[in-house]
């Protein structure tokens, strides 16, 4: 091979490396996205894609502002190997996870109070604030009959 061939090969390798770095997701950090939906009195959380969750914790934001170590209203830890999960509901059981403190139940959420959800999946961590709304079904049951 002559000098011109080596230069063309080097240019192709450099252009290939530039393409891979700028137009692929190989070197971009993974970002976990969380959304919530509070229909019918139940809060459902959706993750951007399925993750093997290692920890879930829900804490009141007002308590978190006054106390760095606020007690969670709901906390789950992975005991060994959780199932890849994309959707879960507040207080529901998730396969492969159990309460951080044995025999504890999730506390009921107070409507209008802001809570923060912390989710961990290995080295990935994310948080999401949400405010539960009043359950319209409960309001309809509470109305007096005319």
Where are these regions (language model features)?
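N-terminal non-catalytic regions of secreted/periplasmic and cell-surface proteins
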Residues: 19-70, 129-146
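Alpha-helical interaction segments
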Residues: 9, 16, 64, 80, ...
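Short, exposed beta-strand-loop hairpins at the edges of beta-sheets
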Residues: 107-109, 114-132
């Amino acid at each position: 091979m002559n000098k011109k061939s080596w230069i063309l090969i080097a240019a192709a390798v450099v252009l290939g490396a530039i393409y891979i770095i700028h137009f692929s997701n190989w070197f971009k950090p993974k970002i976990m996205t969380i959304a919530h939906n509070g229909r019918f009195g139940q809060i459902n959380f959706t993750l951007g894609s399925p993750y093997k969750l290692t920890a879930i914790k829900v804490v009141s934001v007002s308590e978190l502002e006054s106390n760095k170590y606020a007690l969670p209203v709901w906390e789950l830890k992975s005991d060994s190997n959780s199932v890849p999960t994309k959707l879960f509901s507040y207080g529901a059981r998730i396969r492969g996870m159990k309460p951080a403190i044995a025999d504890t139940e999730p506390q009921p959420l107070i409507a209008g109070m802001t809570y923060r959800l912390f989710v961990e999946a290995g080295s990935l961590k994310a948080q999401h604030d949400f405010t539960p709304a009043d359950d319209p079904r409960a309001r309809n049951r509470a109305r007096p009959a005319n």
